[in-house]
Amino acid sequence: MAGQKIRIRLKAYDHEAIDASARKIVETVTRTGARVVGPVPLPTEKNVYCVIRSPHKYKDSREHFEMRTHKRLIDILEPTPKTVDALMRIDLPASVDVNIQ
């Protein structure tokens, strides 16, 4: 697997969960002997939803809700078969979306 690279993208609404998951992945990969670049924080995506507070009228009274999606990028350089096996066995929270390329 020399010369190859594994790119892991993490997405989550909770920044503490994504940071803990990234830390766990980096620790696991460094234990197996591969080189790690990251975690690199990518721009946070912010979605704002505007809702009228009243069910009937009073359009001037509105409430804003926002959803922030935090993203991290981890590159694993020169992965070994032991690294890939360790990544498959790692246990991450369900709130973190993992995309491996």
From Swiss-Prot:
GO biological process, one term: translation
This protein's encoding gene: rpsJ
NCBIfam families associated with the record: PRK00596.1 (NF001861), rpsJ_bact (TIGR01049)
Gene Ontology cellular component terms for the protein in this record: ribonucleoprotein complex; ribosome
Protein's name according to its UniProt entry: Small ribosomal subunit protein uS10
InterPro entries: Ribosomal_uS10, Ribosomal_uS10_CS, Ribosomal_uS10_dom, Ribosomal_uS10_dom_sf
Subunit comment: Part of the 30S ribosomal subunit.
UniProt source species: Saccharopolyspora erythraea (strain ATCC 11635 / DSM 40517 / JCM 4748 / NBRC 13426 / NCIMB 8594 / NRRL 2338)
Entry keywords, A to Z: Ribonucleoprotein, Ribosomal protein
A Pfam family: Ribosomal_S10
